[in-house]
């Protein structure tokens, strides 16, 4: 199918160098708040890219759970494909696709594992059914049918009905220590605005990139 004619103009306005804060997280926070105000579906959803031992890139959508000067945090099953790939290569790429606002944010960096205390604190903040689901799924492994998952979920829901769900030993989190951040704002005539932050010591170097 030819989809070459599916296009539109980007008319929401530009991004100017004079308006950029010195710290990329300040602009990220502003854009994320605007994405939330615009009622975008899952504004914290990010495409997480990793690379396997053969050099094959893999992508999946994961929810951002926390960010600060130390980095961006997400949680996952440590037996998952992405966890195995990050064990071999801790380099990572994140993309926030806020298409409705004609924006995207691209982050690169490397991961560090979260402490058990941090993981446990977040795990027990989740709804109980989500905690149980973490026990049910051996992420990225092959299963014969959905019924296998549903039966295991009901079994564990009964088991943990009157008590706390323990933290699975195979469940954890990563902090992405940020190296670069690129902000993209759609512009008229395909002359989009792109600004690229690169970490330099305790600060950031900012460059404008051609669209």
Curated annotation (Swiss-Prot):
Record's catalysed reaction(s): pyridoxamine 5'-phosphate + O2 + H2O = pyridoxal 5'-phosphate + H2O2 + NH4(+); pyridoxine 5'-phosphate + O2 = pyridoxal 5'-phosphate + H2O2
Cofactor note: Binds 1 FMN per subunit.
Enzyme Commission number, as recorded: 1.4.3.5
Cofactor section: FMN
Enzyme class: oxidoreductase
Binding site for FMN: 60-65, 75-76, 81-82, 104, 139-140, 184, 194
Subunit composition and interactions: Homodimer.
The protein, known as: Pyridoxine/pyridoxamine 5'-phosphate oxidase
Organism listed in the record: Aeromonas salmonicida (strain A449)
Taxonomy of the source species: Bacteria, Pseudomonadati, Pseudomonadota, Gammaproteobacteria, Aeromonadales
Gene that encodes the chain: pdxH
